Each structure stands twice: as structure tokens, then as C-alpha cells.
Amino acid sequence: MCGIAGSFGTKLVKKSDIIQTLDLMKNRGPDFSDYYENKFKSNQVYLLHSRLSIIDLNKRSNQPFKINNYVISFNGEIYNYKELKKILFDKKIKLKTNSDTEVLLWLFIIYGEKCLDLLEGMWSFAIYNNKSNELFLARDRFGEKPLYYSYIDREFIFGSEVKFIKSLSKKNY
């Protein structure tokens, strides 16, 4: 189980609030934690991740994970990722890791939201495209991997636990 959280909007999140949120997330992933931030015109985006290493234990699979202008923060497991790798190999994609995270991100780059039709497993994730300034979120069909979100003061905030949203937004619910 990993932890994911993030924010998308005009609000600048203090580094101390990011660190505090990452500390809250450690119970969901003690192996590694980090964050991605980007400013696009007047918008700010933050993707936070706390990792529990399961499939690929190598640090090259740490998250947030980047390919070109795409960044992902992913919680879950894609059960059929080995079969999906074959699709990528047929398209001459050279993978750099053994992780289902990289497979998922490449599938999204190629197929967009239609990649969800290919997935078997449990997941929640956020993918940000820093060229188009678009954020895409999804969770598995049964909600096995939680994904909470809120739109507060023109700020879209999400997380795998409500307390992560509270920590990033500094609001009480």
C-alpha cells in the first residue's frame, strides 16, 4: 500500500506543509517518499508519494515517476502488467524498470484514459502532463484503492486518505 496526494490550482503550497503531509503518509509507504512540483502560468501542481516497494524494489522505480512530460503518483497493483508489457514491446517502447508504474504511465501516454480498459487490478493514481497542464485521476472500478478529493477555494486537492487533504489544504472538515 502506497500513499498518494496532491494539489492543482493557483495556491502555492508551503514546503513545510508538503513535508508534514509526506510524514503523515509514511504509514502507507515507509520505503521512500518524495514530491513533484511544477508551475504552469498561474497554476501550481504538486504530486506527493509515499512508497511501499512490492514489484520492483529498485530505487529507479521511486515515485513520483516521470516519462517525458508526464508524471505519475500511483498506489496499487496492476495484476496483468506483464501481459501489458508485451503491448509496449510491440510498439518498440524500451522500459527502464520492472515496475507496473512505468507500464501504466506508458499505456496512458499511448492510449489516454482508454488505458483503463486494459487494466486488471486495484489502483488509484494521478498523472500530470506538464506540457498541457492537465491532471488525470482514476481509481479501480470497485474502489479497493481509495481516492478522496475536494475542491476548496479554487484548489483541487486529492489523497489516498482524507487526512492528506486536510494537511495540504489546512482546512478542518
What are these regions (language model features)?
Residues 1-173:
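Cysteine-centered catalytic environments shared across enzyme families
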